[in-house]
Amino acid sequence: GPRAAGAAVRAFLRRRAGVRPERGQQTAAAVVDWFPYATTGGVPNAYLHAGHLFVAGTPCRVSTILGSCVSVALFDPVAQVGGLNHFLLPQGPENTAPSARFGTIAVPWLIDALVAAGAQRRALQAKVFGGACVLRAFRTTAGNLGTKNVQVAKAILQAEGIPIVAEDVDGERGRKLIFQTHDGAAWVRSL
């Protein structure tokens, strides 16, 4: 189930990160924790907090709330393995510990976690969500945070050769996202 897949992914990410965290530091293994809250039609629901990622090879419905943050959903239709991340910033300051709060870390970690869970890299398909400019004061400023988050996600996916098959990005309103790991379906509602 999701917990067994999560344990395998955590072990893989721990090895890949190659760091022993000091007290208070986030590890790659910590970002795959998930928060189950109910089931719908027998499918477990999970809520994904910012700075985390979720991967499962079994049916699961994952939801999150996005403003300027971005979520990348990846899905392998053959292996039926899917995952979602939720990052806050395009990249972290220099000499910052690796964290899924940053797009430059969260997107590669998500790719690696899906491969560790049985997905084939060449079969992955991406969907990108979020990146709104929700603060009125920044709506006229070129290069707002949401736009930068979207640009980082798209650049990494392009560099990895992963096609973006759907997106709902930018704008001025937040979004509620629901993603199904077993079939790649996604629903978005403006907030």
Can you say where each PLM-predicted feature lies in the sequence?
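Short acidic-glycine loop/turn motifs at beta-strand connectors
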Residues: 57, 76-80, 180-183
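Divalent-metal-activated hydrolytic enzyme cores
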Residues: 146-191
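Extreme N-terminal basic, low-complexity initiation segments
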Residues: 2-8
